[in-house]
Amino acid sequence: MAKFDAHLKCSFCGKSQDQVRKLIAGPGVYICDECIDLCNEILDEELVDGQGNSRHSHEPSRKAMPAARKSSKPAPTLASIPRPQDIKSFLDQQVVGQDAAKKVMSVAVYNHYKRLAWQGDGQGETEETATRLHKSNILLIGPTGCGKTLLAQTLAEMLDVPFAVADATTLTEAGYVGEDVENILLRLLQKAEMDVDQAQRGIIYIDEIDKIARKSENPSITRDVSGEGVQQALLKMLEGTVANVPPQGGRKHPYQDCIQIDTSQILFICGGAFVGLEDVVQKRMGRNAIGFMPSDGRGRSRANRDLQAAQVLRHLEPDDLVRYGLIPEFIGRMPVSAVLEPLDESALQSILTEPRDALVKQFRTLLSMDNVQLQFADDAIEAIAQEAHRRKTGARALRGIVEELMLDLMYDLPSQTSVKEFTVTRAMVEEHTGGKVLPLPGAEQQKTA
């Protein structure tokens, strides 16, 4: 036993039991009196620093924290802000359809950045500029894969501002396991490279906002830490407050250095599918159908059902969102709302070919690097769109289908140097037999997209 004790050493500094005055044992670890004294010194110095009596803190803990920095970019000016029609034209290049939602977002974003430029001019002494302009956050309602996130991303790209995406399902009320709402601001700050001024002019998109709806219309009598509790925690951030953001993320704790961010200039865009919301609207209107939505869905195509659901949501009122599960205070902080329509087969075909980064163009570019000219027959484009519409996941289904179709082609074509041109046909889409690189009879006569 004496021989075993001689090999005991501190788990932190590595000194043996003979080199220190005291060695304290824990469950599988040991710590010496010198390491304990060092820990006490670190805690005492940080405590004094937090009270403002000293600016000396332990150097290692300072080095681990990213520091906020001042912005080198000027605030936007009225002349530099694109007009609503210019914003919509830019959105048209990336997002197919959704004209009503594009118009709503273009005007809302234009007014938001006009407000920032107006405040940045330093002319607040006159009677005209003394009027305070409040921001208008945006609520996007639409089925999955209809372009909600892409709209927000395209806006941020055009305006050259930091853009962060957060998932509402990961947020919990303070004091519970999960992410604090302040972590959303940390993501925006990281996108701005820790530039606070730039982050305060950014855009935050909170996805799956419908998933934090409370379970019933009545206020909860028990803790709903990932539903109503998160809505309550988001209220001040959406309205505008100075939030303390921990630079390393995670939970805040006393004496922790935080970065202060003013959220009054941050544009919040919340999006969600809100499945079943059309039923709430119909119930409010007092009947199972409102003239164009028969109660018996037999015999109706899915395209007609989706179109009719979108028509129902045009009659949406704030009370319907309250009945769905959002609290009135939360709805009041999202004054601008836009309903996105589900994508039909025609829109899905356009998504495949028209946008700047369309899937067809991407795969053509990839195969052109192997000196192969790839073509998609018109009926193949139609078949892909039909399959994507059947899968009910919107535009997201397109990439999955095309990836499945092109897998074997992308594997074989680079090795077959004799093949200079290849056309994807409808039969290949329907049977997913694109793996065999065979000459297609009459391929050159096929009308291609």
Swiss-Prot record:
Zn(2+) binds at residues 10, 13, 32, 35. The keyword Zinc applies. GO terms for biological process: cell division; proteolysis involved in protein catabolic process. Residues 50-83 are annotated as: Disordered. Keywords: ATP-binding, Chaperone, Metal-binding, Nucleotide-binding, Zinc. ATP-dependent specificity component of the Clp protease. It directs the protease to specific substrates. Can perform chaperone functions in the absence of ClpP. PANTHER family: ATP-DEPENDENT CLP PROTEASE ATP-BINDING SUBUNIT CLPX-LIKE, MITOCHONDRIAL (PTHR48102:SF7), ATP-DEPENDENT CLP PROTEASE ATP-BINDING SUBUNIT CLPX-LIKE, MITOCHONDRIAL-RELATED (PTHR48102). ATP binds at residues 143-150. This is ATP-dependent Clp protease ATP-binding subunit ClpX. It comes from Synechococcus sp. (strain CC9605). InterPro entries: AAA+_ATPase, ATP-dep_Clp_protease_ClpX, ATPase_AAA_core, Clp_ATPase_C, Clp_protease_ATP-bd_su_ClpX, ClpX_bact, P-loop_NTPase, Znf_CppX_C4. Residues 1-51 form the ClpX-type ZB domain. CDD domains: RecA-like_ClpX. Belongs to the ClpX chaperone family. Pfam families: AAA_2 (PF07724), ClpB_D2-small (PF10431), zf-C4_ClpX (PF06689). The keyword Methyltransferase does not apply. Signal peptide: none annotated. GO terms for molecular function: ATP binding; ATP hydrolysis activity; ATP-dependent protein folding chaperone; protein dimerization activity; unfolded protein binding; zinc ion binding. GO terms for cellular component: HslUV protease complex. Component of the ClpX-ClpP complex. Forms a hexameric ring that, in the presence of ATP, binds to fourteen ClpP subunits assembled into a disk-like structure with a central cavity, resembling the structure of eukaryotic proteasomes.
